[in-house]
Regions:
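Bacterial N-terminal signal peptides that target proteins for export
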Residues: 1-13
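Generic secretory/membrane-interface signal
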Residues: 4, 20-21, 207, 238
Length: 273
């Protein structure tokens, strides 16, 4: 295939994805306004619920090392933004404040927990916070409470709490949804897309702070990227990077977030009666 033809195929693929789920500039969520609850008054939230916004989204992120080129709050910025996109597409949702402390493993975990700035919650503590947040929102009149997590360790606790509360509240008219496909299916779709479109291997894309993660933060919060520090695998074995962030772009980030949000919506709709 010639270079021109390859570029044409790549452009067509990108265009098709954008048509499926457009994210034009005016659709970018504003975290300092509704439907983000921390930017609303209690009376505005009350009136929104009374007006039919009875879905609550609880995003979970993380405070972890992301190499020399990317800020610690990567997951928080991405999942807060993605929750806004999810709320837009559902049309009847409000967003709780993002939980920024999540399980990150042992405090002294080599090349991870021992890096300055990493904050880790034990699984039981994380689950207690989720449990309390969901119970609080139930009291206020939300009928469907969504949990989405931007990091792998978040998924287990989300699933556990959703299962326990759904069993406890069976028949009460309130459902808790752990939308793990946002993370689990989302990352598979992103990886496959990058392989088919650019020919990039899974190793090149990486599993942490590589092409996908860096692209998403470039799209959501470009100030969180230190471009002069980007290097394949962070430039050293102890950098905390798996993959090649130099391949990242905001365009890829936009597509990646679309994949994740679409996977979450599909899972949510499949669970509805």
């Amino acid at each position: 295939m010639t270079t021109i033809m390859h570029r044409a195929v790549r452009t067509a693929t990108l265009a098709a994805l954008v048509v499926v789920s457009p994210l034009v500039a005016q659709d970018r969520p504003d975290p300092y306004a509704a439907p983000y609850m921390e930017s609303m008054t209690w009376t505005e939230i009350r009136d929104a619920i009374a007006g039919g916004k009875k879905v609550a989204i609880i995003p979970t992120g993380g405070t972890e090392q992301n190499g020399p080129h990317m800020v610690m709050g990567k997951h928080n910025y991405i999942v807060t933004f993605a929750a806004g996109v999810l709320a837009q597409r559902l049309g009847n949702a409000l967003i709780a404040p993002t939980l920024q402390y999540v399980p990150e493993g042992d405090y002294n975990r080599p090349n991870w927990g021992d890096k300055p700035g990493v904050i880790s919650l034990p699984d039981p503590a994380y689950e207690k916070v989720l449990d309390a947040a969901v119970r609080s929102l139930k009291v206020h009149g939300f009928t469907d409470i969504i949990l989405i997590g931007d990091s792998g360790p978040n998924q287990r606790g989300m699933t556990s709490i959703a299962k326990a509360l759904n069993a406890e509240w069976g028949g009460a008219g309130v459902r808790v949804h752990a939308l793990t496909d946002y993370y689990e299916q989302g990352r598979i779709l992103i990886r496959d897309y990058l392989n088919k479109t650019y020919g990039w291997s899974e190793q090149m894309v990486g599993s942490h702070a590589g092409t996908s993660d860096t692209s998403q933060l470039l799209y959501v919060f470009s100030q969180g990227i230190r471009k002069d520090k980007m290097a394949p695998n962070g430039g050293s074995p102890d950098a905390g990077v798996q993959g090649d962030p130099t391949k990242a772009s905001p365009e890829i980030g936009k597509i990646a977030i679309d994949f994740k949000v679409n996977a979450a919506i599909k899972q949510f709709k499949a669970a509805m009666p």
